Amino acid sequence: MTPSEFRQSVRHGAFRGPTAGHCGPYAQANLAILPEAVAHDFLRFCQANPKACPLLGVGEPGAFRVDALGEDLDIRTDVPSYNVYRDGRLTERVESLEALWRDDFVVFAIGCSFSFEDMLAREGIGLRHVEEGRNVPMYRTSIPNRRAGIFGGQLVVSMRPMRGADAIRAVQITSRFPGVHGAPIHLGDPRELGIADLNAPEFGDAVTIRDGELPVFWACGVTPQTALMDAKLPIAIAHTPGHMLMTDITNASLAVF
């Protein structure tokens, strides 16, 4: 299935689940959508936190298409599920933004680690959340983001359990792709990130960690949602964690070496 066909299936309600494992050669994007009045501060926030918030594209005010991301793409309908935040609280999840869209909304598309999972799988590195049919586990850490204007919050990480040799290879592979979070930020003891229980992720689903495996943590594009909550905007919108926008950008084009 091409990215365009995948977006059509989402647009027409045929697909509503997590997007990991779909359209493997193509990049997926996290979303943050917020009023133009605070868009400059949010752009500075992304620039100050590039590991967690690598930008793939930014829309014009009111535009629900971002040409850099793909053709026949509609931000309002082409994501399986959206989170709506009001005054810093998650108030609803919706399957379309058509009724909520405003002329002052600015779209930020942020790289997603699902994008490099195809390369990991090609190298024979297992992805437990895909194997178990679950959403990838994501955790809010105790690490503060670098603040920009009203935006702060804490770093969020995704976790994939791996054997040591696979973890080393994963570092080598993902280092080539800083536009989708790049190399892991931590391997091993989750307490060093302020994570108390790997079986209780704040976002996504817990997965099995087998004997001899260690947790490998990547900076995650859900991080901006902690910043949106921290800012307590009257309204802000994001993808539901694990439910991404499929783009026409090839993963190969994002490699830096």
Swiss-Prot record:
NCBIfam families: PRK05463.1. Pfam families: D-Glu_cyclase (PF07286). GO terms for molecular function: lyase activity. Disulfide bonds: none annotated. Belongs to the D-glutamate cyclase family. This is Putative hydro-lyase Bcep18194_B2576. Keywords: Lyase. Its EC number is 4.2.1.-. SUPFAM superfamilies: PSTPO5379-like (SSF160920). It comes from the Bacteria. HAMAP family: Hydro_lyase.
